Amino acid sequence: MARIAGVDLPNNKRLEVALTYIYGIGWSRAREICEKTGIPCTKRVGELTPDELNTLRKFIDENYKVEGDLRREVQLNIKKLKDMGCYRGIRHARGLPVRGQQTRTNARTRKGKRKTVGGTKKAKAK
């Protein structure tokens, strides 16, 4: 298994697919990396030479923010929004949708599992 940016890439996958295992690299960026390094996208990770792996590592480290650095930056951006007290920051803090989606129904992904309120039974009249 090849290791790039702290992620083990599976040997049997094509390079463009394997690169998407790295946080911060999607399909289009994986293709772009292959083109700029001159390594064919269809080549399997197990078939890569050590020189090609070093080229990939160096190119990704120099040109892109991936894995831990990217996660840290995203978390800092969210923290900055919360500290400012702006609308988006408040929505993040409350665990509600940030981009204007409705919340009267749905929004379950952001809100989490429903919390049932108990003890609301009415007493029987005699």
Curated annotation (Swiss-Prot):
One biological process term in Gene Ontology: translation
Subunit and partners: Part of the 30S ribosomal subunit. Forms a loose heterodimer with protein S19. Forms two bridges to the 50S subunit in the 70S ribosome.
One of the record's GO cellular component terms: cytosol
Molecular functions per Gene Ontology: rRNA binding; structural constituent of ribosome; tRNA binding
Gene3D superfamilies reported in the protein's UniProt record: 1.10.8.50, 30s ribosomal protein s13, domain 2
Family to which this protein belongs: Belongs to the universal ribosomal protein uS13 family.
Record-linked PROSITE patterns: RIBOSOMAL_S13_1, RIBOSOMAL_S13_2
Lineage, highest ranks first: Bacteria, Pseudomonadati, Aquificota, Aquificia, Aquificales
Record gene name: rpsM
Keywords on record: Ribonucleoprotein, Ribosomal protein, RNA-binding, rRNA-binding, tRNA-binding
Biased composition (Basic residues): 107-126
Any single Pfam family the record assigns to this protein: Ribosomal_S13
Protein name: Small ribosomal subunit protein uS13
Region named Disordered: 95-126
Function: Located at the top of the head of the 30S subunit, it contacts several helices of the 16S rRNA. In the 70S ribosome it contacts the 23S rRNA (bridge B1a) and protein L5 of the 50S subunit (bridge B1b), connecting the 2 subunits; these bridges are implicated in subunit movement. Contacts the tRNAs in the A and P-sites.
NCBIfam families reported for this sequence: uS13_bact
